[in-house]
């Protein structure tokens, strides 16, 4: 399996688990890499840091649900693993601009 396929496999894992706690070590293990090596390769191949990628995907998913469902921000905040709902409205406004 080449590195592209490993990164793809780790991204698939992230997508499946967006609403769960995601361990960065577990993501790296999906690519059969150490965390430090995976961080470097992920950023090089995607142009974004791993944590930022996860944060952005959760934000986009929560924004989509906010617009297309009747779910409340507080429910979405907890669903997408925000510790408190307070930062989500501001982040969503930035995302929707």
Q: What is the role of each PLM region?
A:
Residues 4, 8-25, 44-80:
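Terminal helix-turn-helix DNA-binding modules in bacterial transcription factors
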Residues 38, 42, 87-88, 92:
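Short hydrophobic/aromatic patch on the recognition helix
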Residues 31, 80-81:
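Core residues of bacterial helix-turn-helix
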Residues 34-35, 83-84:
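Short coil turns linking two alpha-helices in DNA-binding domains
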Residues 1-5, 90-97:
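…primarily DNA-binding HTH/wHTH and HhH modules…
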Residues 73, 83, 95:
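Active-site beta-alpha loop architecture of Rossmann-like, nucleotide-cofactor-dependent enzymes
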Residues 13, 31-32:
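Short, positively charged
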